[in-house]
């Protein structure tokens, strides 16, 4: 579960390393895996596509909080991570690092296809 002012890792090669959650789309108070959030780039790599302080949209792909599956099992990750996306939902980077939780059907298929492992 992601709340406002949370510092998140970036799981793609867009150039951002850490981002700050500054808002949610859809009038929500918190975000889970698959939700789109508004972030501000805080730590960026030199010569990346992302500029420090700029505002971007991102989709949550990993959370530290446990996620309950339909079969009763739970899954949790070691970090909260996002992938930066544009207005159409396509990722800004060309690679996605680490495992990605299965995202809602029909949404962010490009992000899931770039992921190394989909859980």
UniProtKB/Swiss-Prot annotation:
- Give the matching SUPFAM superfamilies: Ribosomal protein L14
Organism domain of life:
Bacteria
Q: Which GO terms describe its biological process?
A: translation
Would the keyword Ribosomal protein be found if you checked this record's keyword annotation? yes
Q: Which UniProt keywords apply?
A: Ribonucleoprotein, Ribosomal protein, RNA-binding, rRNA-binding
One example GO MF annotation: structural constituent of ribosome
SMART domains noted in UniProt: Ribosomal_L14
**Tagged with keyword Ribosomal protein:** yes
Q: Which InterPro entries match?
A: Ribosomal_uL14 (IPR000218), Ribosomal_uL14_bac-type (IPR005745), Ribosomal_uL14_CS (IPR019972), Ribosomal_uL14_sf (IPR036853)
One Pfam family, short name please? Ribosomal_L14
**One GO CC term, this protein:** cytosolic large ribosomal subunit
Q: Which family does it belong to?
A: Belongs to the universal ribosomal protein uL14 family.
Q: What does this protein do?
A: Binds to 23S rRNA. Forms part of two intersubunit bridges in the 70S ribosome.
> What NCBIfam families does the record tag this protein with?
rplN_bact
What HAMAP family would the database entry show? Ribosomal_uL14 (MF_01367)
Subunit comment for this entry? Part of the 50S ribosomal subunit. Forms a cluster with proteins L3 and L19. In the 70S ribosome, L14 and L19 interact and together make contacts with the 16S rRNA in bridges B5 and B8.
Check the record and name the PANTHER family matching this protein: 50S/60S RIBOSOMAL PROTEIN L14/L23, LARGE RIBOSOMAL SUBUNIT PROTEIN UL14M
Q: What is this protein called?
A: Large ribosomal subunit protein uL14
List the source organism: Anaplasma marginale (strain Florida)
């Amino acid at each position: 579960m992601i709340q406002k002012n949370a510092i998140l890792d970036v799981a793609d090669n867009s150039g951002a390393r850490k981002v700050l959650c500054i808002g949610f789309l859809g009038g929500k108070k918190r975000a889970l895996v698959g939700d789109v959030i508004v972030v501000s780039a805080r730590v960026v790599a030199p010569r990346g596509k992302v500029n420090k302080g700029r505002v971007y949209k991102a989709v949550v792909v990993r959370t530290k909080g446990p996620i309950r599956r339909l079969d009763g099992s739970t899954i949790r990750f070691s970090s909260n991570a996002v992938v930066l996306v544009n207005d159409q939902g396509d990722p800004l980077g060309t690679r996605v690092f680490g495992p990605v939780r299965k995202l809602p059907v029909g949404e962010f298929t490009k992000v899931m296809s770039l992921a190394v492992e989909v859980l």
